[in-house]
Each structure stands twice: as structure tokens, then as C-alpha cells.
Regions:
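Short loop/turn segments immediately following beta-strands, especially the blade-tip
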Residues: 31-34, 72-78, 117-121, 161-168, ...
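Loop-centered beta-sheet repeat module
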Residues: 103-156
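A short beta-strand motif characteristic of beta-propeller blades
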Residues: 1-2, 37-43, 80-87, 123-130, ...
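Structural signal for beta-propeller blades
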Residues: 24-28, 67-69, 111-113, 156-158, ...
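Blade-level signature of beta-propeller repeat domains, shared across WD40, Kelch, NHL, RCC1
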Residues: 248-252, 266-282
Length: 282
């Protein structure tokens, strides 16, 4: 079995959800893990999605170039298209975050985060606007959805918003890099620990991993090399004792030990060869 353009992957039960392209069209495919066969695919986009995530039997994808968000449902191991949210060509849609009955979509090239109401046919209900060349990329909520933490790609900044329903109030903004060091750099992934005490962020070009403490108020407590070049994505292990980062330009995955008490990265413990890796899941 071969799947072209498999940039992003997620797992639902015994099924892999994989982005794919075929005959100049792109979309997603469902692959049975046991039999290694393609169960179904829908190819409606002109370029491959850059993000895929599932919640229960619903799948959400974001397309950077097409500027669309696609919503699917898995029904009897087949894909059913629920909604295509068309934002704008080259909007830079980079993620879909679930919040109550809303979808939150960072639109990197529009310098906006757009919020859509699931219960009202995915209508646009809120837009957060950022200064030009900020490039909001990925965000995470804390456990009770009272704070939304966002990383920007173009300006390499961290944003902390207080959240009350659809009111997003900016509390803190941190520069991950000095302004004169932004050339040829771009921040990428963001993760939060289960106890909501620490944030981790990767920055390409500078090849950095940044640790932010959320206690009292957000502050940077550590920045170290990612163990390779172009750290596009990373994850925390289930027990949060390790951080695994994929470095695309050096074709490797670096594994770091974490100190759960202070959130800091202790040391690099292993590096494995992984060709052209751009995403990672457990």
C-alpha cells in the first residue's frame, strides 16, 4: 500500500486518518491499521491539508493554500462530508481547535483567528485580529477552557488570552526571539502539560525548544537546541517524562528527558533517523 503526500496523520480506533493526493486532487484517506488497506478517501481539495484531527467520529482538516476547513464524519468505516468552510484562497488555515460548540481556526496569512459556530451551520461568529505579519499558527486551551495559548509563526510570539464564552482578552505576549533574530525563523508547534503548568513551543530556523511556565504569569524559563534542524512538530509522552521532536531538515527525531517538577528539558537521550518528518502522534 502506498499513500502519496501523507503529510499529516491522526488515529481513530483501528483507523489511520491520513492526508493524501491523487490525480491533482487532495484530501484524506482512511486506512485500516490491521489490514493496511484503504477503506475510503475523499479528494476535493487542490492542495494537501496541513492539519488533521478527529474528535469522536468527526474529522477536521485545515488547508493552508486552499483556505478551507473540511468537516467529515466516519460512518461504517466510510467518510461522509459534513461541511466545507471556505475562508479565502491562501488564507493560511493551519489548525482546527475545538471549543464548546465552536471551531477555532488560526489563519496565518490573514493575521486572524476565526471562530465558527458548529450548531449554526458553521457560521463565522468571531474574528480575532493580529498586527500584520504576526501569523497566528497553533493554539491550545488549558483544562477548563479559561485560557487560550497561541503561538505565531511569522513574529514568533506567544499569546495568553483569558476566555469567557466568546470574549478573548489578551493578558500576556512574549517574544520567543529578539526582533532582530526573526529572519529565516518560524515558530511551529505548541503543547501544554496535563497539569496546565508548562507550555512547550518549537521554533524552526533558530531550531529551538522553548519552555514557558504558566505559574503566576507566563514566563520563559528555558530555551535549548531541538537536536536537529527545522523542528516542525513534537509531542509529550503519555507520562510527560519525555518530549519527542521531529526535525525535518536533518531527517531525525530527537528524544528529550523532562523534569516534571520544574518543566525543564533535562537532556537529549536519543536521536533516530526519520526521513523528512513533519508530524508526530502517539
Amino acid at each position: 500500500m502506498s499513500i502519496d503526500d501523507a503529510k499529516c496523520v491522526d488515529r481513530y480506533e483501528n483507523i489511520l486518518i491520513i492526508t493524501t493526493s491523487k490525480n491533482n486532487k487532495s484530501g484524506i484517506a482512511l486506512v485500516d491499521i490491521s489490514t493496511k488497506t484503504i477503506l475510503d478517501e475523499i479528494l476535493l481539495e487542490n492542495s494537501s491539508p496541513c492539519f488533521v484531527k478527529h474528535h469522536d467520529d468527526f474529522i477536521y482538516t485545515a488547508n493552508y493554500h486552499d483556505g478551507v476547513v473540511m468537516v467529515y464524519q466516519i460512518v461504517n468505516n466510510k467518510l461522509k462530508l459534513i461541511k466545507q468552510i471556505s475562508i479565502q484562497n491562501k488564507a493560511g488555515c493551519h489548525q482546527v481547535v475545538l471549543y464548546k460548540n465552536y471551531l477555532i481556526v488560526p489563519c496565518l496569512l490573514l493575521d486572524q483567528v476565526r471562530i465558527f459556530d458548529i450548531n449554526n451551520d458553521y457560521d463565522l461568529v468571531k474574528t480575532l485580529t493580529f498586527p500584520a505579519k504576526t501569523g497566528p499558527r497553533h493554539g491550545v486551551f488549558n483544562h477548563d477552557y479559561s485560557h487560550f495559548y497561541l503561538v505565531s509563526e511569522l513574529s514568533s510570539e506567544f499569546f495568553d488570552f483569558s476566555v469567557d464564552n466568546l470574549e478573548f482578552t489578551l493578558n500576556t505576549k512574549l517574544n520567543l526571539l529578539p526582533k532582530d533574530k526573526l529572519d529565516n525563523t518560524s515558530s511551529a508547534a505548541i503543547r501544554i502539560t496535563k497539569d496546565n503548568r508548562f507550555i512547550y513551543i518549537s521554533t524552526r530556523g533558530a531550531d529551538l525548544l522553548t519552555v514557558i511556565s504558566l505559574e503566576n504569569e507566563p514566563k520563559i524559563i528555558q530555551q535549548i537546541n531541538s537536536g536537529g534542524m527545522h523542528p516542525r512538530d513534537f509531542i509529550l509522552s503519555e507520562d510527560e517524562q519525555y518530549l519527542l521532536v521531529v526535525n525535518k531538515d536533518t531527517d531525525d527525531m530527537s528524544s528529550f528527558q523532562l523534569d516534571k517538577t520544574n518543566g525543564k528539558i533535562v537532556k537529549l537521550i536519543n536521536t533516530d533517523k526519520v526521513p523528512h518528518a513533519i508530524g508526530i502522534i502517539l
